[in-house]
């Protein structure tokens, strides 16, 4: 079995979840297949219930952090069943010095939209959801 040569650290440890290092500088567009809940181990080592998104194009999933969840809700609404079939553009960003997967936007929105992300004990941040993968 021929394997591809890894070019990013994230590729050394493949797993169930999409990792930002696998994007190789691109912004992939993926179609949401399903949104579910799962018990995942958090950074603190404790099990937490988190949203997990499955996609049509890959068996890899995206664990849903609050920032990405707020962006998806702004684009697609509160009813999760209505997210199925929607396309989402992902990109690699930095968070606490580490690569992180973020939502760039969706070709299913009609124009760029501003989203304010308010997290507990943090200053609100402004994000823009884009219609295309290009900046």
Residue ranges and their predicted role:
Residues 1-135:
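Short beta-rich binding modules
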């Amino acid at each position: 079995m021929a394997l591809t040569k890894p070019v990013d650290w994230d590729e050394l440890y493949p797993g169930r979840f999409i990792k930002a290092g696998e994007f190789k500088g691109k912004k992939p567009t993926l179609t949401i297949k399903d949104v579910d809940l799962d018990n995942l181990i958090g950074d603190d080592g404790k099990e937490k219930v988190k949203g997990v998104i499955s996609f049509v194009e890959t068996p890899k999933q995206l664990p849903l952090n609050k920032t990405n969840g707020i962006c998806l809700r702004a684009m697609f609404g509160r009813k999760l069943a209505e997210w199925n079939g929607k396309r989402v553009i992902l990109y690699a960003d930095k968070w606490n010095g580490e690569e992180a997967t973020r939502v760039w936007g969706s070709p299913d929105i009609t124009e760029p939209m501003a989203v304010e992300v308010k997290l507990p004990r943090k200053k609100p941040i402004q994000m823009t959801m884009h219609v295309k993968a290009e900046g």
